[in-house]
Every structure is written in structure tokens, then in C-alpha cells.
A protein has these predicted regions:
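Short aromatic-glycine motifs in intrinsically disordered, low-complexity regions
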Residues: 133-147
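Short, solvent-exposed aromatic-acidic interface loops
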Residues: 130-137, 199-203
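Alpha-helical hydrophobic helix detector
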Residues: 13-29
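N-terminal leader/signal peptides at the extreme start of proteins
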Residues: 1-8
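Short linear sequence signals and composition-biased patches located at protein termini or domain-edge surfaces
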Residues: 153-203
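Residues that act as N-cap/strand-start positions at coil-to-secondary-structure junctions
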Residues: 113, 139-142, 193
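Extracytoplasmic beta-strand-rich oligomerization domains located immediately C-terminal to a leader/signal peptide
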Residues: 26, 30-134
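Structured surface patches comprising rigid loops and adjacent beta-strands/short helices at the edges
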Residues: 68, 145-159
Length: 203
């Protein structure tokens, strides 16, 4: 055995340490990149899911809108003298971002009557409120709203009319439109994203 076995020089040790540091830095940056990508994907997924939930709930409210339930039976033949039934769907919108949608729909539980639902936009958040179901008029007013969708920077709505064209409301109210188009712009981590939802055609 060679009693004078040669060891590592100081330079070799420093080079080895430097190489290990470089490898560790590359590995850390790779892990950090994966972590950031995963966080962005989770954020995008949550934003997409919240948008889908909002649109699905809106579509369900419209699908369950009242129709003949609000019409009193004509038992005495004096139909023309009876007060007109309230609109099942009432929309007010403007180019300034004003948006309010009122819906009278069937209650979630069959046999509980009708309930009022209201959607509106305030300070970049879309809210939804609903009143207690009832089988008597007047129906209870919607309670305190629940935030459904945040980050809304613009919301435009148009209605479909009998002339087969879309029309803006310019701040006016439209009752029982044939169809509703909603264009929504959100601020996300990837910038502004635009979405379009069409509900209808309504009977």
C-alpha cells in the first residue's frame, strides 16, 4: 500500500463545491418554476370554475322561470279585467356597466311555490340574492346578496327582439325578452379575459 496516497487539492475541492452549487441552483430554479406553474394552473382553474358556476346558476334560474304559474285561472270569464301578471324576467342594463336581472322562478323544492331571484353588478362583483319561496303574492323580496363572481371590470347585456336582432337597453328595462346575451370581462392573472353567454330563446 502506498503510504503517500495523493488526496484532493484545495482547487479540486473548490471546483467540486462550485459544481454542486450550480447543480443545486438549477434544481431549485426548476422546482420553483414547477411550483409557480402549478400555482398559476390552480388559480386559472379556480377562476374558470367560479365563472362556470355563475353562468350555470344564471342559466338554471332562467330555465326555472315562472310561466303559467303566475296566471290566475279565468273562472268568471273576466280575463280582460284581471291585473296583468308580473314579468317572470326583467332586465335593466346600460353601456356604463349597469346590470340588474330579476327573475321569478320555481322554488328548488317542488311544491313550495315561486321565489324571486336578483342578479346585479356592484364594484366589480356579481351578486345573487333570492327570496323565500311562497305560493302567495306578493312574493318575499330577495334577501342579502351573495358574491358569485369577482374581478368583473365590464359587463354588457343585450336582448333579442322579434326583429331577429340584438338590441342594447341604454339603461331601460325590458320585461320577458326573447333572449339575453351577456358579455363579461374579468381581470385575471393572465390579463383581461372576455366571455360571452347567451340565454334563451325565451318563450
Amino acid at each position: 500500500m502506498n503510504k503517500h496516497q495523493r488526496g484532493f487539492t484545495l482547487l479540486e475541492v473548490m471546483v467540486a463545491i462550485l459544481l454542486m452549487s450550480i447543480v443545486s441552483l438549477i434544481a431549485w430554479r426548476g422546482l420553483d418554476s414547477v411550483t409557480r406553474t402549478d400555482a398559476r394552473l390552480r388559480e386559472n382553474t379556480e377562476q374558470t370554475e367560479s365563472l362556470l358556476r355563475a353562468f350555470n346558476q344564471l342559466e338554471r334560474d332562467m330555465a326555472l322561470r315562472a310561466s303559467i304559474e303566475m296566471q290566475e285561472p279565468d273562472l268568471d270569464g273576466a280575463q280582460n279585467d284581471r291585473p296583468q301578471a308580473p314579468a317572470a324576467v326583467s332586465l335593466r342594463a346600460a353601456d356604463t356597466g349597469e346590470f340588474r336581472l330579476d327573475v321569478i322562478r320555481s322554488a328548488a323544492v317542488s311544491g313550495e311555490g315561486l321565489q324571486r331571484v336578483r342578479w346585479w353588478l356592484k364594484d366589480g362583483t356579481l351578486y345573487r340574492a333570492m327570496g323565500l319561496p311562497s305560493d302567495r303574492y306578493p312574493l318575499p323580496a330577495p334577501k342579502e346578496g351573495v358574491a358569485v363572481l369577482g374581478g368583473v371590470v365590464d359587463l354588457q347585456a343585450r336582448i333579442w327582439k322579434a326583429d331577429n336582432e340584438w338590441h342594447t337597453l341604454d339603461g331601460n328595462r325590458e320585461n320577458d325578452p326573447k333572449g339575453i346575451e351577456i358579455r363579461l370581462t374579468r381581470e385575471t392573472g393572465q390579463g383581461r379575459e372576455e366571455y360571452r353567454k347567451v340565454v334563451g330563446l325565451l318563450d
